[in-house]
Structure formats: structure tokens, C-alpha cells
Amino acid sequence: MRLSNRPFVLQINVSPRGGLPKKAVETVKVTKMGLEGDYNTFRMTKLSGDPTSAVLVIPRETISEFARAGYKLVPGSMGENFTLEGVQYDELSIGRRMLLGKKDQGPIIKIERVCDPCDELLVYGKSFPKDAYGKRGMYASVEREGRVEKGAPVEFLS
């Protein structure tokens, strides 16, 4: 259950074999290596499973901006694991920590770096990877594992 006017998890997205778009699920366990049932080809092949790239988050508003510019995007299209509502992109600064869900059960993630656009985004148009540069989302590590569900509150801890 979410509280009004508070940030929350709008959608949880996974892709068991990689690729875009990721598909929505209602609930998920978040581990140090990412979301159960999700496979990130780039992280596993190019980054050797780097845990600082365990989770990808993006605000819904960023996806909506691209949609208003004519790109056919919906939550999950950018490859993000968590689409957040009520959060601005500039709030996802490096080092920022967030609790997703209940204080005693929800995962705690830490923003680590910008996710650079990859060639998989070409499915949305030739110029899209360039247009998405700096706005693809933010990679995060998992400080505390836990379970989170769609609609869960997002609390900034730092």
C-alpha cells in the first residue's frame, strides 16, 4: 500500500533471458546480484557480474519525457528493474541510498553510476541511444537484500 504524495515503486521489471522490454511482475526478491528472475546480458558478460550494477532504476517521468518526444516507451522499455513514481532524475545522485518497501523487509540500494545507453535501445529508433545518453537510468548496488512489491514506498536514506 502506498501513501499519497510519496515516492513509490510504480513497476518492477524483469527479463529472464535479457533483452528489451523487460516484463512487469508484482513482487520480487532483490539479492546482491540483482532481481531474482532477471538477467542483464551487459552486466553478466561485459562487467563480469559487477555487483555495483545489480539494479537499474529510472523515474517514470523520464520515460514519459521520451514518450512525449515521440518514442514509443512504457515502463520496462529502458531495461530498468524499478520504475519509480514521484522521484526526479536528479534525485538519483551517486551515493544516494534508498529503501524500497517495508523498513524491516525491503531492500536497500545505493546509487553507483549512470547507465550508458546500449545498442539494444536501437529498437526505439536510430537516434534513441544518443538521445538517451545521461538519461537511461542509474545503476545501484544492493546493500540489504529483501522483497519488494509493486506500489511499495521509496524512502531516501541519504
Label each region the model flagged.
Residues 1-158:
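Metal-cofactor-dependent catalytic cores
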